[in-house]
Amino acid sequence: MSEGRRVQAVISQDLLDRVLAIAGTQTILVGGQALAFWASYYRIDEPVAAISKDADFLGSRNDVDRFATGLNGVVRLSDRRMKTPLLGRVEVAISDMEYVHIDVLLEVFGDISQKAIRERSYAATIGTKTFKVMHPLDVLQGRLENVYGIKEKQDEHGVEQLKLAIQVVRAFVLAEASSDRTGANRSVILKHLNRIERMMLSDAGRKIAKRFGVHVADAMEFPGLATHSDFRTKRLPQIVTCMSPARIEELRKAAVLPAQPATSRPTKRPSHRRP
């Protein structure tokens, strides 16, 4: 079978589970599959256009070899002369016609350091196997900066992933608010909202909202904050100006925002003609 006739397939859940078992806690699941993990965790439907074909991990050169050995895959290394975050790629044949890619990265695109991603990552479990996955807010920032800074991501796939990441972060903030660990601590929720606010006010946040109509501010939820007078009168009005009309309407219906005042048509004054 010639190389040119083979096609890249979407990684199946069974194969992904095998990959995650091999990944362990040495690597961190990032990118589109990290987004898919959180969408599944919060029971959010993933649009077909948002599905990622491959799996990306933050890791080391040794991790490339671990994946290749565990999956009986072929290692494809990046040219060292090229400046690329890709340390290596493992190509796994799933049939004579199809293959999938497992990419191991030194860093992710955008203004997020490897150190910060590692420190904020979550440990997750499938069966008896534990692996690490990128923090939901890091996922959102990654999707935003991808659409903003990578031309190939400025398509339906990239935009749908950003929309999905916004939904995921909303679910995450609500879950944090109801958690026994963080729910009683309003400063934890404010910290998350502060980070979303920085994204929405960034050059990426503003330009993506203008060009694609996708508003990062829509990721905000305000559990326990909307009734706080200082927050409601000072910060909330500023945040709302960066939201989509649909999200503003949702918040009005939920009584988080005041209802739109009814507009009345001005009374037409009778004209006076001179006799």
Q: How does the language model describe each region?
A:
Residues 1-275:
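Compositionally biased terminal segments of proteins
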